[in-house]
Amino acid sequence: MDQMLSPNFSIPSIGTPLHQMEADQQIVANPVYHPPAVSQPDSLMPAPGSSSVQHQQQQQQSDASGGSGLFGHEPSLPLAHKQMQSYQPSASYQQQQQQQQLQSQAPGGGGSTPQSMMQPQTPQSMMAHMMPMSERSVGGSGAGGGGDALSNIHQTMGPSTPMTPATPGSADPGIVPQLQNIVSTVNLCCKLDLKKIALHARNAEYNPKRFAAVIMRIREPRTTALIFSSGKMVCTGAKSEDDSRLAARKYARIIQKLGFPAKFLDFKIQNMVGSCDVKFPIRLEGLVLTHCNFSSYEPELFPGLIYRMVRPRIVLLIFVSGKVVLTGAKVRQEIYDAFDKIFPILKKFKKQS
C-alpha cells in the first residue's frame, strides 16, 4: 500500500474533508459588491485615455481595497448615480409632447398614450375628452385651442333657453276642452223694484207667477241676467271670465240709470262648463261596471254616463258618441286637469269598430 502511493501524499485525518468546497460554496469574510456592467453604444463609450475611464478604474480599486462590503458601509456608486440634476424641458420638447397629445385625442387616434398620461391635467385637456369629434377637429392646437373649442361648443349648442313645461302625457294634445258657459254672481247692495225695472228697461221680462226675478238680456257680451228684489244678480252665458265680469257691470249700470243706488260688490264665478269630443265611441256599460264608485248610468232616464270625480271636484257627462261635458269648476285649470285624468280611462273603453 505504501509503495503504491507517492512519497509526498499524506492520508488526511478523520476530521478533514476529502474534497475541497466549490467556489460557490465558499464563504467570503468580506465580500465586495461589483455593480453590473451596463453595455453602452460605441458612440457613448469614453476614450481609453479619458478622465472618466481613469475615474472608474480608481473607483474600482478603492472598492476592492476598502471595506465597502455588504455587511459594512454601502457600496460606493458612480458619481452619475449620486448626483441627479433636473432640467427644464426645451420648447421643442414641449411642442412635440403637445402634438402627440393632440394626435391621441384625434378621431383616428388610439386613445390615451403614456406620453399623454404624463402630461399635467389642465381644464382644456380635461374638456377635450368631453367634446364631440366634430368640435375636437375644429378646436385647433396651441395655447388658444381650448378657447376656440369652447366657443365652438357654444356656437353649436346655441343660446340657452328656458325649458318649456312638459304637456300632460295622459291627454291628447290635440283635444282641449272649450268653455261653453260661466255662471257668476254679484251683489248690488240695494233693494230693487222689479216692476219698475221690467217697465223701463229694454229686453227685460218679469212674470212673478213663474219666476220671482227679472230676466234681462244684452247682446254684447251675449249673456242673460237674473235680477232679484234683494239686490242679488246672477249672470250666465259668458264664454270667458272677463266677458262674465264685463256683462255683470253692464247690468249694474242699467240698474243705476233707472234710479237705484246700485253698487258692484262680491263678484264671484260660481260655475264653469266646458265640453270636448274625444273622436271615438265609448263603451259606457264597461265603464260603469269598472268605476261603479264614481259613475252612474241609467240609459232609460238619461243617455249619458254621470262621472263624479273627487279631485278635482268635477262632474262629467260622458256620452256614447265620445262627447264629454265637464261642469262644476271654479277655475279654468280644474276643467283641464279633470279631462287629463279621464282621457286615458276613456281610451281603455273605446269601442272596437
UniProtKB/Swiss-Prot annotation:
Biased composition (Low complexity): 49-65, 85-106
InterPro entries: TBP (IPR000814), TBP_CS (IPR030491), TBP_dom_sf (IPR012295), TBP_eukaryotic (IPR033710)
Keywords recorded for this protein, A-Z: DNA-binding, Nucleus, Repeat, Transcription
SUPFAM superfamilies hit by this protein: TATA-box binding protein-like
GO biological process terms held by the UniProt record: DNA-templated transcription initiation; mRNA transcription by RNA polymerase II; RNA polymerase II preinitiation complex assembly; snRNA transcription by RNA polymerase II; snRNA transcription by RNA polymerase III; transcription by RNA polymerase II; transcription by RNA polymerase III; transcription initiation at RNA polymerase II promoter
Localization annotation: Nucleus
Region Disordered, annotated ranges: 20-121
GO MF annotation terms: general transcription initiation factor binding; RNA polymerase II cis-regulatory region sequence-specific DNA binding; RNA polymerase II general transcription initiation factor activity; RNA polymerase II general transcription initiation factor binding; RNA polymerase III general transcription initiation factor activity; RNA polymerase III type 3 promoter sequence-specific DNA binding; TFIIA-class transcription factor complex binding; transcription cis-regulatory region binding
Entry annotated with the keyword Nucleus: yes
Residue windows of the Sequence repeats: 179-255, 269-346
Gene Ontology annotations for the cellular component aspect, listed alphabetically: nucleus; transcription factor TFIID complex; transcription factor TFIIIB complex
Keyword Endoplasmic reticulum recorded: no
Biological function: General transcription factor that functions at the core of the DNA-binding multiprotein factor TFIID. Binding of TFIID to the TATA box is the initial transcriptional step of the pre-initiation complex (PIC), playing a role in the activation of eukaryotic genes transcribed by RNA polymerase II.
Family statement: Belongs to the TBP family.
Subunit structure: Belongs to the TFIID complex which is composed of TATA binding protein (Tbp) and a number of TBP-associated factors (Tafs). Binds DNA as monomer. Interacts with TFIIA-L heterotrimer. Interacts with Taf1, Taf2, Taf5 and Taf12.
Stored PANTHER family: TATA-BOX BINDING PROTEIN
Protein name per UniProt: TATA-box-binding protein
